[in-house]
Amino acid sequence: MRFAPQLEQGRLLIRYKRFLADIETDSGELLTIHCPNTGSMLNCMMPGGRVWFSRSSDPKRKLPGTWEISETPQGRLACINTGRANTLVEEALRAGVISELEGFTTLKREVAYGQEKSRVDFRLEYPDGYLYLEVKSVTLGFDDSSVAAFPDAVTQRGARHLRELATLAREGVRAVLLYCVNLTGIDAVRPAKEIDPVYAAALREAIDAGVQILAYGVHLTPDEIVIDRRLQVHWLD
């Protein structure tokens, strides 16, 4: 996926009210832009840090742009726009990059399912069956470590999705959770038990129920982002 229009660069001043960020562009322009991320963004919102944003040409839009990429304190690039993850995964699925899920004949997005009335990111249909696929965008990294972690904030919604997937797996339905690690310089991902122990416990229960866990990393520059490799998944028991 190439970023279009071309991203512009600036420096972060402050993120506030969750969905807003003040930045200064390289040309000295002061802007308030949309922050498309509900997490804590622990290592992605350092004041003074480099950011890249897409500028909107829609005159009716209240904010002039959307925050897309941050440079982390570790010097990595992180795509903080969580809305990109599902598009990236769909591109990778259709290109056959995610080999574990190859062979589907139909792909459906945002399908209602489960006892808790959730919506799963993808339903893939095969000649001999189907599966449900939930995607999580990962941007949390640490100093001197190539292992990313999820989540970066307590996520009741994430735990609910795991419960739904676990229920499906117990019923004999193939259920898959895929971590899309939108952070450069990463080789593996793990549950952030120190941030959300409830989510970590739900993940262990989902694995025990038969939910398949996958993780894939990206090639990311200010010009493009694409899923390009499988990553390891580390557990904290």
From Swiss-Prot:
Q: Which domain of life is it from?
A: Bacteria
Q: Name one GO molecular function term.
A: DNA binding
Q: Which Gene3D superfamilies match?
A: 2.40.50.580, 3.40.1350.60
* HAMAP family linked to this entry: SfsA
- PANTHER family in UniProt: SUGAR FERMENTATION STIMULATION PROTEIN A
Q: Which family does it belong to?
A: Belongs to the SfsA family.
Protein name (record)? Sugar fermentation stimulation protein homolog
The coding gene here is sfsA
